[in-house]
A protein has these predicted regions:
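Short hydrophobic beta/alpha edge segments that flank linear recognition/processing sites
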Residues: 204-207, 244-267
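Short, compositionally biased
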Residues: 261-280
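Tryptophan-rich substrate-binding surfaces of secreted polymer-degrading and adhesive proteins
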Residues: 3-99
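Hydrophobic beta-strand signal
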Residues: 13, 65, 72, 185, ...
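Aromatic/His-enriched, Gly/Pro-containing loop or helix-boundary segments
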Residues: 219-244
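Contiguous, well-ordered beta-strand patches that form the walls/edges
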Residues: 370-490
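Surface-exposed, glycine-biased beta-strand/turn segments
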Residues: 100-204, 212, 224, 248-249, ...
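Residue-level "contact hotspot" at macromolecular interaction interfaces
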Residues: 57, 183-186, 240, 246
Length: 490
């Protein structure tokens, strides 16, 4: 029955009914969480009324009395405008300080608000009390791993997670058996709060709350097993499960064989200072500024084993995703007229009283169509990558190119308004393996070796960049600006 699909935490259709009742008659609202997904939340916690005893602002469209007030309403950052709760726009929040934010601005939601749900309780203990005493992948099963910050396909901006390699990837796909699956285990005690499908029978997401503001996240997990076996057997019916399953350090919750395992840590007490405009991440991936280095959490022996397999050999070994240089070309950019990471036009947020769906943009091939990043490569940090969601197709055709700096040419992190327009040549890039690297097995998908570097490949033409006096960036894939010039903002 339809009611069977309505339950706390189950996914709902953003374009379907806004309210519903479960089999017991409890009322739920279809609400958007900080992860961009819509799920059923009880009306007692979804803050669907005109006010709230927990949050200063109510739901979109409800009445408010404190003009200009900005705050979290349980689902999003809102503002009181002319007595009505509306989306907070970038013009409503304070401008980023010249030196950037070194800690969370008061208007930005906490990690607990983002990942803990509307009824989440802020922890009072310190993250320093959490220690990862078990590996996620047994060290003898771990293969070379990609650090934070890769730019690939429609992951246009540097990715906020690592990819842990597994030795089964060295086996040709056609030769892999059930015995080649490798256990994925919890690094510390915690509570599994989410199991969801990423759209494929062999790709899942798991979130573990370790307490004290530390969360670990795992994606493209091939199988959910162990303590998640029962939940996994029911997952196909709804695609998303909000859970509360205790797990101990070293306890298995999944198996991996056919791809690298996405892994990262969020720490609600840390803040990445290298984002020039944190507001841009309110529309999707709101957790991004809380991305933290997982290496210090592990015991020394496990840390050493994981570091040994990280492809990047320069500090920080885990990589860096926040590469914005205020006043220069380096870092993340979003097409002028769009509202940050979500990819929708700002106009979609201005007067709406319903939540703007996340994860896709109507009429576009990808939400990242409006993204642009000019950042150092995640492994070979001597090389600069231009990553764009819109190359030739305005609907979105994400691609990454190597920027070939010539002698005396200003690097992107030094390209400022005073530099004027700068033309860079772009090329495909090749991978150069360290001497003595064994030949790759045909049909395998083993990760590239630790310490590889990039070489310049086939030329793809030029790009012209100019930082403007208002700190926006003009770009065109040509050697001179024409009417096709685009402008991006932070």
């Amino acid at each position: 029955s339809a009611n069977a699909k309505i339950a706390e935490g189950f996914l709902c259709d953003a374009n379907g009914p806004a309210n519903g009742k479960d089999a017991s008659g409890v009322e739920f609202s279809c609400t958007k969480g900080g992860d961009g997904k819509y799920s059923w939340r009880s009306k007692q916690t979804s803050n669907s009324g005109s006010g709230s005893s927990i949050f200063s602002l109510g739901a979109l469209g409800s009445k408010c009395s404190k003009e200009g007030e900005i705050g979290w309403n349980g689902l999003l950052v809102a503002a009181c405008k002319s007595g009505v709760v509306k989306y907070a726009l970038v013009s409503d929040v304070p401008a980023t300080p010249a030196s950037g934010y070194t800690s969370r601005p008061t208007w930005y939601p906490t990690l607990t608000q983002i990942l803990g749900g509307p009824s989440g309780i802020e922890p009072t203990c310190s993250p320093s009390t959490i220690k990862f005493t078990k590996p996620v992948i047994a060290l003898d099963k771990l293969a070379p791993s990609i650090p934070y910050g890769m730019m690939v396909s429609d992951h246009v901006t540097p990715i906020d997670h690592a990819y842990l390699g597994v030795i089964s990837l060295a086996i040709p796909q056609a030769s892999r058996t059930a015995n080649d699956y490798i256990a994925v285990t919890a690094p510390a005690d915690g509570v599994i709060t989410e199991l969801s499908s990423l759209g494929s029978p062999s790709s899942h997401r798991v979130v573990i709350n370790h307490g004290c503001n530390i969360y670990s996240v795992y994606m493209v997990l091939n199988k959910a097993t162990g303590v998640l076996a029962d939940s996994f057997s029911k997952l196909s019916n709804n695609g998303f499960m909000s859970l509360s399953i205790p797990i101990k350090a070293g306890e298995e919750f999944g198996r991996q064989r056919d791809n690298m395992l996405d892994f990262n840590i969020f720490d609600g007490t840390q803040w990445l200072s290298g984002f020039a405009n944190p507001y841009s991440y309110l529309t999707q991936d709101t957790w991004k500024p809380y991305t933290a280095d997982y290496l210090p959490l592990f015991t020394d022996d496990i840390r050493a084993g994981m570091e040994k397999q990280l492809q990047r050999t320069s500090a920080p070994r885990i990589g860096k995703i926040d590469q914005d240089v205020i006043g220069a070309a380096a870092g993340n950019w979003f097409l002028a007229g769009t509202n940050g990471y979500g990819g929708n036009l700002t106009s979609a947020y201005e007067n709406t009283t319903v939540q703007v769906p996340g994860g896709s943009v109507s009429g576009k091939n990808t939400y990242a169509w409006s993204h642009l990043a000019i950042a150092r490569h995640e492994v070979d940090t001597s090389k600069w990558i231009l990553s764009t969601g819109w190359y030739k197709d305005s609907k979105g055709d994400p691609v990454q190119f190597l920027i070939n700096l010539t002698a005396g040419q200003v690097a992107p992190d030094k390209l400022t308004a005073s530099s004027g327009a700068m033309v860079y040549t772009l090329s495909q890039f090749s991978y150069i393996f360290p001497a003595g690297t064994p030949a790759r097995v045909d049909g395998s998908s083993e990760p590239y070796p630790v310490g590889y570097t990039l070489g310049s490949g086939t030329s793809v033409g030029s790009v012209i960049l100019q930082v403007n006096s208002d700190n926006s960036l003009s770009i065109e894939f040509a050697s001179t600006f024409t009417s096709d010039k685009r402008t991006y903002k932070r």
